[in-house]
Amino acid sequence: MEVFDYENVQLIPNKCLISSRSEADTSVEFGGHRFKLPVVPANMASVIDDKLAIWLAENGYFYIMHRFEPGKRFNFVTDMKQRGLISSISVGVKEEEYRLIDELVDAGLTPDYITIDIAHGYANTVIDMIHYIKKHLPKAFVVAGNIATPDAVRELEDAGADATKVGIGPGRACITKLKTGFGTAGWQLAAVRLCAKAARKPIIADGGIRHNGDIAKSVRFGASMVMIGSLFAGHKQSPGSDLVIDHRHYKQYYGSASAKQKGVYKNVEGKDLLVPYRGDIANTLNEMAQDLQSSISYAGGNNLQALRTVNYVIVQNTIMNGD
């Protein structure tokens, strides 16, 4: 098996066919809707809240609301429906999550997107939840994860998942690799490639994104969407706490399996970090769009499809060369 990660890969340029980078179309169709970018902020409590979800939906970006305030999800779906915006929530697999599905059914509410979000998504509990959602809310687009292997992709798709989310512990706030010895840290991009080759439906590459160019690499190796945590955690709209240390502004960023999120030190596989403050999220999204337009121009096309066929090289150590 060929193993590599984002820092080990460089894409090889093709002849540019557009007059200006601005001609490149970065939009993507996902689940019956078209979004401006193939990126989605991580569904983590320190990355997204209801206010940011509304802003993203209003401005043409995909989002997935986190599941860590379970009592608010029903009202969140109701509010988004009333606003005429896309509704996208996360659920787990415990008994109370089934009750939420029942409440939505009873109220005649179908979220546009439901993401089944647990650390090890290749599980019977996830398959059972897919079956339940598809039986009772058949029009919802179901994303299931997180997973790491082609077998997992095939089984979750066969169960009814409309998309799968790939990545076990490659993110900055995750320490699954250290606590358990398992995961895709260090080979996340190769895992995306393996899973995409097996997939008949879209996949979301989740975790390990350190630079904007990693978005293009994810698309090259088969991702329809790219989930990003740390790069989206430092904005004025980010829910994490603001801190100033030695006159430098930071935002708090913590993993979904961290003691901070759990409220107790039990089965901890995440950590609490500080990330530099980055201002308005709109500026970051604009920069990502511009960089992705440049990527498309290097690929020799005018849309994301051009990225999927470019050649690449694997370098020995890292493309950063000490930078």
Swiss-Prot record:
Active site: 174 (thioimidate intermediate)
EC number: 1.7.1.7
PROSITE patterns xrefs: IMP_DH_GMP_RED (PS00487)
Entry-linked Pfam families: IMPDH
Keyword NADP: yes
GO molecular function term, any single one: GMP reductase activity
Residues that coordinate or bind NADP(+): 203-226
Presence of the UniProt keyword NADP in the record: yes
Record GO cellular component, one term: GMP reductase complex
GO biological process per UniProt: purine nucleotide metabolic process
Alphabetical UniProt keywords: NADP, Oxidoreductase
Catalysed reaction, written as an equation: IMP + NH4(+) + NADP(+) = GMP + NADPH + 2 H(+)
Similarity field: Belongs to the IMPDH/GMPR family. GuaC type 2 subfamily.
HAMAP family: GMP_reduct_type2 (MF_01511)
Physiological role: Catalyzes the irreversible NADPH-dependent deamination of GMP to IMP. It functions in the conversion of nucleobase, nucleoside and nucleotide derivatives of G to A nucleotides, and in maintaining the intracellular balance of A and G nucleotides.
Name of the protein this chain belongs to: GMP reductase
Record organism: Oenococcus oeni (strain ATCC BAA-331 / PSU-1)
Upper taxonomic lineage: Bacteria, Bacillati, Bacillota, Bacilli, Lactobacillales
Gene this protein is translated from: guaC
